[in-house]
């Protein structure tokens, strides 16, 4: 809550008219007072003094995860509890998209063909839309 370079950046942002936010774990921390949108998560003292990766760091990560998840939902990237418009930037996400597609569309059982469709379309939702618009696709 008192790191000088963070306080300096917050001040520069304020001078430039850039809105700022922060997540802090100490009530009324200077950083929270300097930010436009502070989030104070009072976790109390750490079990091991000086080890902020425990309660404080974990609580901040949870807050960031909640914000990120909420944004994904608001942007229409989630249907039910499935991420259907994720950017497929690695093998894990491609595999997950294939499994989600096959779960949502059980008539498609050939994993490799589903994978080709997912890669062509770019997401689960776009693959489903592509199938609806082109009934002659070989899948």
Locate the predicted segments by residue.
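Internal, active-site/partner-interface "lid" segment
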Residues: 65, 69-105, 111, 118
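NTP-binding/hydrolysis catalytic cores, primarily Walker-type P-loop NTPases
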Residues: 105-139
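Glycine-rich beta-alpha junction loops
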Residues: 27, 43-45, 87-90, 121-122
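Glycine-rich phosphate-binding loops that contact phosphosugars or nucleotide phosphates
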Residues: 1-62, 68-75
